[in-house]
Regions:
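Short, well-ordered beta-strand segments enriched in hydrophobic/aromatic residues
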Residues: 125, 135-143
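Short, highly charged low-complexity linear segments
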Residues: 72-78, 140-149
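C-terminal capping/lid segments that line or modulate ligand- or cofactor-binding pockets
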Residues: 2-110, 114, 118-126, 130-132
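Surface-exposed beta-strand/loop patches in extracellular or lumenal glycoproteins
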Residues: 99-104, 115, 142-153
């Protein structure tokens, strides 16, 4: 058990995952995304800690907690939101009043995902992403304002 040697830092792991997504390394991105979502289920209140131990997985057990990790940790609390941004490829452009979803996809275990009251400038939207043949199918559920929604495949 070590603070810097072999521990998992969710914030840093997410930065790596998003870099993989950006450069088209989809399978490694999804592997890290899935691992982080699986890990967070085991922490009280779904609060992602600052770090946890990088020991091998054991069937039926969650990650080994690092005894003095900050929990919750501000930068780790943002991990889930960053990963959602990554899977949907959210690229907000408030100055242009446009929200682009760049190659949206969902991990195999996530059949659908809804975002409500997503704000862009003075506009608000609600979206639903569902498993599709070529990435995630996007449905606009609600729009308040004149924000343009662009889905790039």
């Amino acid at each position: 058990m070590s603070y810097h040697n072999g521990s998992i830092w969710p914030h840093d792991t997410t930065i790596v995952a998003l870099g993989m997504r950006r450069y088209g390394l989809i399978e490694p991105f999804l592997t890290l995304t899935t691992a982080l979502f699986e890990a967070v289920r085991h922490f009280p209140g779904y609060r992602m800690p600052e770090l946890f131990c990088g020991f091998a997985r054991r069937s039926g057990h969650g990650p080994t907690r690092y005894p003095v990790a900050c929990e919750p940790q501000a930068w780790s609390a943002g991990v889930v939101f960053h990963l959602i941004t990554g899977v949907l490829g959210l690229l907000p452009a408030a100055a242009e009043n446009r929200l682009t979803l760049d190659r949206p996809l969902l991990p195999a275990w996530l059949k659908w995902l809804e975002l409500h009251d997503l704000r862009l400038g003075k506009s608000r939207v609600a979206l639903r992403a569902a498993q599709g043949r070529e990435g995630a199918a996007i449905e606009l559920l609600a729009r308040d304002g004149d924000v343009e929604i662009v889905v790039r495949r």
